[in-house]
């Protein structure tokens, strides 16, 4: 989104990340990763129910974009594409880097960055057995430049274990996760909504106004089971018998970046803390986005909607939705009500022109 890029440029002094300067690089990567707008055959029955609901509600929607090359429509996206058509790093950047001389070490975890005279001079790592998890060897790599790209969780942890100076006090802070919940709708006719492309369409009616974005997508049964959303005993059996009648969406909302990641203790024997819980405003945003998803399903003809709560709340009519949602309360720190997930934690090593507000300079160098 160009508005996001321009916001980074103006708010944090990151002129090189403005849409004018940075967009060409993003477009180049998009071409490399085969990112394209879903075509008609990539929009499955689950997505069509979302479309029907949006059309009736007069909500804006559009086909989603995916990084996939000639999708085989197998539906195993969450478990790894069986035909390697999803353009993940496993089939793109890693083999491309290897072809240009990069050496890749599997089962090897960077413990800390080695520094000398105020500069990063290499890394210290340990190698583990992939089956037993046992520590089998140590490794040291000397380098003129060290690039940390371990995501919003492990990048600050490595820096903290390395005792890198934190001038701004922001290292590991400002964790945002953009939480989402999965809402399921049950329909009269069989949909087999887990077949075909996982993500078909997105609802962008509320993206700019409220920060809500809703994507169609019903996980295959075993993937949903991993989230603990499929009940137990007889209830599980009944749920599975009806799985072909379900459609699903992921309802995203925004958060304020109040979480943190922290390492305590020795670099090898210490432990990490990942802390995030919603405040009441963020909690209400999660509830509102889930409610919109439910209304879309009812407008699309759903007989029942399953709300993403630990209470296993089921709604039989749009007229009962508000009453049901009144039962969803903040509870203990807002953490034990919704079954929330995150795909995109970020913010823990933020970049900026002010060394007292940011961890990383606009050049990518740590202050």
Residues covered by each model-derived region:
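Patatin-like phospholipase A catalytic core
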Residues: 42-67, 287-289, 295-324
């Amino acid at each position: 989104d160009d508005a996001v890029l321009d916001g980074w440029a103006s708010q944090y002094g990151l002129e090189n990340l403005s849409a004018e300067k940075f967009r060409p690089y993003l477009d180049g990567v998009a071409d490399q990763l085969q990112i394209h707008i879903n075509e008609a055959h990539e929009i499955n029955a689950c997505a069509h129910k979302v479309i029907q609901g949006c059309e009736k509600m007069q909500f804006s929607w559009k086909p989603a974009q995916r990084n996939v090359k000639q999708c085989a429509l197998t539906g195993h996206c969450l478990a790894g594409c069986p035909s390697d058509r999803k353009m993940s790093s496993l089939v793109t950047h890693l083999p491309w880097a290897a072809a240009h001389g990069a050496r890749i070490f599997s089962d090897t975890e960077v413990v800390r960055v080695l520094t000398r005279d105020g500069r990063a001079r290499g890394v210290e790592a340990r190698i583990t057995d992939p089956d037993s998890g046992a520590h089998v060897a140590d490794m040291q790599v000397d380098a003129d430049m060290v690039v940390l790209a371990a995501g919003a969780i492990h990048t600050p942890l490595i820096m903290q274990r390395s005792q890198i100076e934190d001038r701004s006090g922001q290292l590991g802070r400002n964790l945002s996760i953009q939480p989402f919940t999965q809402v399921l709708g049950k329909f009269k006719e069989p949909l087999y909504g887990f077949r075909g492309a996982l993500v078909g369409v997105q609802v962008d009616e509320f993206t700019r106004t409220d920060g809500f974005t809703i994507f169609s997508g019903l996980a295959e049964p075993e993937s949903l089971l991993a989230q603990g959303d499929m009940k137990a005993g007889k209830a599980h059996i009944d749920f599975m018998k009806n799985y072909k009648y379900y459609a699903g969406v992921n309802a995203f909302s925004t958060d304020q970046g109040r979480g943190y990641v922290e390492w305590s203790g020795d670099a090898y024997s210490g432990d990490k803390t990942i802390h995030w819980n919603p405040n009441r405003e963020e909690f209400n945003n999660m509830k509102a986005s889930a409610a919109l998803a439910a209304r879309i399903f009812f407008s699309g003809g759903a007989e029942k909607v399953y709300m993403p709560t630990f209470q296993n709340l089921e709604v039989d009519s749009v007229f009962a939705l508000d009453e049901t949602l009144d039962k969803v309360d903040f509870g203990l720190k807002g953490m034990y009500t919704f079954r929330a997930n995150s795909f995109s934690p970020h913010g823990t090593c933020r970049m900026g022109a002010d060394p007292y507000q940011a961890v990383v300079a606009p050049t990518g160098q740590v202050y």
